[in-house]
UniProtKB/Swiss-Prot annotation:
This is Phosphatidylserine decarboxylase proenzyme. Belongs to the phosphatidylserine decarboxylase family. PSD-A subfamily. Heterodimer of a large membrane-associated beta subunit and a small pyruvoyl-containing alpha subunit. The keyword Membrane applies. GO terms for biological process: phosphatidylethanolamine biosynthetic process. It comes from the Bacteria. Its cofactor is pyruvate. Keywords: Cell membrane, Decarboxylase, Lipid biosynthesis, Lipid metabolism, Lyase, Membrane, Phospholipid biosynthesis, Phospholipid metabolism, Pyruvate, Zymogen. The active site is at residue 182. It is a peripheral membrane protein. Catalyzes the formation of phosphatidylethanolamine (PtdEtn) from phosphatidylserine (PtdSer).
Length: 214
């Protein structure tokens, strides 16, 4: 699958432009001795908004990781967006991770639901139910329901979602972005087999999060 997005996310272009202009102006006025912190800031902003292509596993029943980060939860929990008990796997993204979100499975979107909320530390459990969040519920061709939830964090105050109910999604397809540290919860049917453990570092699209029961 071709990756139809620039390696530096469009969401970051305005921030990069501002950081570059500030660094150039200060460099022109005061030289590198005064400007180096602003050049360093520019490097940080560029790396934050990187959005590289990732290999996508071909395994048909695989649930792919929707985001870069670290696993903070693997547990049975209530999926409030699909009204069921489910296997919940949570990925926490710090400010150094790639912050685009990608579809964990192939399927059709049955629901997209946004909830305003707080901005607690996204690494803690209650962020799942109390923070600002956006849920995308996906139905696979085999009738499985997979819910992917973007959750804002302590610093992240902007959730971007580019898909709507009724649209198709392909595994690994980019569908959203959260700025400056956040979390993604994935709810899977009971019987799915988790392939990751708490504390494990994971990568969007290339890490297999779980396997759906066949």
């Amino acid at each position: 699958m071709n990756y139809p997005h620039p390696i530096i996310a469009r969401e970051g272009w305005p921030f990069i432009a501002i950081a570059a202009v500030v660094a150039l102006l200060i460099h022109a006025v005061g030289g590198f001795g005064f400007a180096w912190p602003f050049w360093l800031l520019l490097v940080f902003v560029v790396q934050f908004f990187r959005d590289p292509q990732r290999p996508i596993p071909a395994q048909p029943n695989a649930v792919l990781c929707p985001a870069d980060g670290r696993i903070v939860a693997v547990e049975t929990a209530q999926d409030p967006y699909a009204n069921r008990e489910a296997l919940k796997i949570s990925v926490f993204m710090n400010v150094f991770n790639v912050h685009s979100q990608r579809s964990p499975v192939d399927g059709a979107i049955s629901k997209v639901e946004y909830f305003p909320g707080a901005f607690l530390n996204a690494a803690i459990d209650k962020a799942s139910t109390e923070n600002e969040r956006n849920a995308v519920v996906i139905q696979t061709a085999s009738g499985k329901t997979v819910t992917s939830v973007q959750i804002a964090g302590l610093i992240a105050r902007r959730i971007l979602c580019y898909v709507r109910a009724g649209e198709p999604l392909s595994r690994g397809q980019r569908y959203g972005f959260i700025r400056f540290g956040s979390r993604v919860d994935v709810y899977l049917p009971l019987g799915s087999r988790a392939k990751v453990s708490i504390g494990e570092k994971v990568y969007a699209s290339s890490t297999i999060l779980a396997e759906l029961e066949q």
